[in-house]
Amino acid sequence: MKAIRSLKTLALALTVIAFTTACQSDDDNKNPANKPGYSDYKVRMTDAPGNFTEVNIHIQQIRVHSDVDGWVDLTTNTGVYNLLDFANGIDTLVASDSIPSGRVSQIRFILGDSNSVVVDGMEHPLTVPSGSQSGLKLQVHHDLIPNITYEVLVDFDAAQSIVLTGNGKYILKPV
């Protein structure tokens, strides 16, 4: 039950951030990959500062759910990201692609097994119970207009999202 509640909290928090979408017309963007009936969709990531030395998440894939094509895998910059590298106004592009215009209802971060947290110089595995199989889910509900570039900024709050359990394990419960 706690996992469902934390997932709903994550979705609500990140939905608010996701709606801070920046849009540009194709004239401003000059992206040759943009095709008629398609929109460019970019996912960026940032973090609020926390009390950890490192918070590493292993991004394997970012996908969006489109009412036109169902699940679409975005071209993803895979790898292990230290969330603390992206604080204080710094962000990074983690996925980008041209997708069919229409409604995007959800973004999923598919994470690998190399998630970790460094505390007092010691690296500990970081478990992601709510998204270990299907990914961290973000409800967004964006209506995409053709030839517009959309950017979604996902702001992880590592300080509030990492929990030390009673048995000494660290889990990621995004808020």
Q: PLM features: what roles do these ranges have?
A:
Residues K2-A11:
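Bacterial N-terminal signal peptides that target proteins for export
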